[in-house]
Amino acid sequence: MKTTFRRLQCGILAVAWLLAGCNSDVFIDRFLSAEPSVSLSETEKEVTVCFEADNWDILGVESLREGVAVSATDLEGKNSKYLPFEEGETGIVYCKNAFLDFRVEKRNGSELHFISGENLYDQPFETFVRVGNRYEEKVIRVSFSPTRKYQIDSVSYCLLY
């Protein structure tokens, strides 16, 4: 009887020790169940991706083409920021070159807005936005359809003597 009681005590202590070892960092809310793919065009210039939790940040914006300048500011567009954003930080990421411009806005922890300016390339432009936290990272694939090119209606010259 004494050995059964001793085993029961050891079992209870072992379970208590295991439960005491768990902390809140182990239980992380999943912020995005799947890696979405987003398409923007001339008719659909804005797309919003919704998140399941607010424990994520914008980690970076990458493209397969070189020459895309990436800059970040606060929501008012005034103060410069660096990527990756700090935990819970909001802001706007601007991506631009001679043929393309778009922006990614994190206004709160539950949504990410993609806003297209123009894509003057002859084919769709693809970029990847990395979002995540210190435990998990996801990639959102974004495709921009080509927009209409500029057309010159007329050229006039003025000769000055």
Regions found by a protein language model. Name each.
Residues 38-44:
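Short, solvent-exposed loop/linker segments at the N-terminal edge
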Residues 44-111:
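Surface-exposed binding patches on compact interaction domains or structured appendages
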Residues 2-10:
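Bacterial N-terminal signal peptides that target proteins for export
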Residues 23-26:
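Bacterial signal peptide processing site
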Residues 146-161:
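Low-complexity, Pro/Ser/Thr- and charge-rich linker/hinge segments at domain boundaries
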Residues 18-21:
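C-terminal motif of bacterial Sec signal peptides marking the signal peptidase cleavage site
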Residues 122-134:
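A short beta-strand micro-motif common to beta-rich folds, especially ectodomain repeats
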Residues 108-120:
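Short, hydrophobic beta-strand segments
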